[in-house]
Regions:
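Flexible, processing/modification-adjacent segments and terminal tails
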Residues: 39-45, 51-59, 64, 70, ...
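Short hydrophobic/aromatic-rich beta-strand segments that constitute the beta-sheet cores
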Residues: 60, 85-89, 102-106, 160, ...
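Sec-dependent N-terminal signal peptides
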Residues: 22-33
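One face of beta-strands
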Residues: 56-62, 73-77, 85-87
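An acidic-aromatic
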Residues: 76-127, 199
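Short, Lys/Arg-enriched N-terminal segments with co-localized hydrophobic residues
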Residues: 6-18
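Gly/Pro-enriched, hydrophobic low-complexity segments
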Residues: 145-219
Length: 219
């Protein structure tokens, strides 16, 4: 052996395996961070775009899909920023939110209710009010939802799943918001309850920033 010769000691196999696992974990974490950053950009763009809208009037189609029955009704949706909206259907059914109260004759809900902090009715009202304004991250923070986003079929699709323990098992477990990819404006809100029912609200022919009679929201 010549003086000064150094022989490399090979890494044990288990160390190599652990290093590969570590690199895989790092790659997953970096990918997740990148996705989270993309989600934040998307949610901010949706909020910025819809937050500029002061009011709108739109055609509304509501489809309630139950395991053995599907019903559809049409009507008109009115919204005035930030806390007033009315869904008025040709069937005579309705849902009206006027700041801290909601009056409903739709589905399983009939009557006038106060929108109490943290209550199920407030959560329901916020789904629509926040959705109209693109405030999906605010909805998640204020009402206890986790969020997932994807883009498909010309829509940015945001799925909000309830994680607030006090509300799990009542109301809606999942809400899906669909915004157009070309302009970030709202197209549809779909609610899923714990009984397997799906309640879809699709808006079309939207007229933005139009004057709306305040009597529309009075009750």
């Amino acid at each position: 052996m010549q003086a000064g010769t150094v022989f490399a000691t090979p890494f044990p196999r288990f160390i190599i395996i652990q290093m590969k696992k570590l690199l895989a974990v790092i790659s997953i974490v970096l990918f997740a961070i990148q996705l989270q950053a993309q989600d934040i950009v998307l949610l901010n763009q949706i909020k910025t775009t819809n937050g500029k809208i002061k009011s709108f009037e739109a055609d509304l189609e509501n489809t309630l899909t139950k395991p053995k029955k599907t019903t559809t009704q049409n009507g008109t949706l009115y919204f005035v920023k930030p806390y007033e909206f009315a869904a008025l259907f040709t069937t005579g059914r309705f849902m009206i939110v006027n700041e801290n109260r909601i009056k409903m004759d739709i589905g399983l809900f009939h009557g006038t209710f106060k929108l109490k902090d943290g209550g199920m009715m407030q959560s329901l009202g916020n789904i629509f009010l926040y959705g109209f304004q693109g405030r999906i991250q605010d909805l998640a923070n204020d009402n206890g939802y986790s969020l997932k986003t994807k883009t498909e079929n010309g829509f940015h699709v945001i799925t909000a799943t309830i994680i607030k323990k006090r509300l799990i098992g009542i109301g809606y477990k999942t809400v899906v918001f669909k915004y157009h990819t070309d302009n970030f404006l709202l197209s549809e809100i779909v609610l899923y309850d714990y009984s397997g029912n799906q309640d879809s609200y699709v808006i079309s022919n939207v007229k933005y920033d139009v004057p709306i009679n305040k009597k529309t929201f009075q009750f």
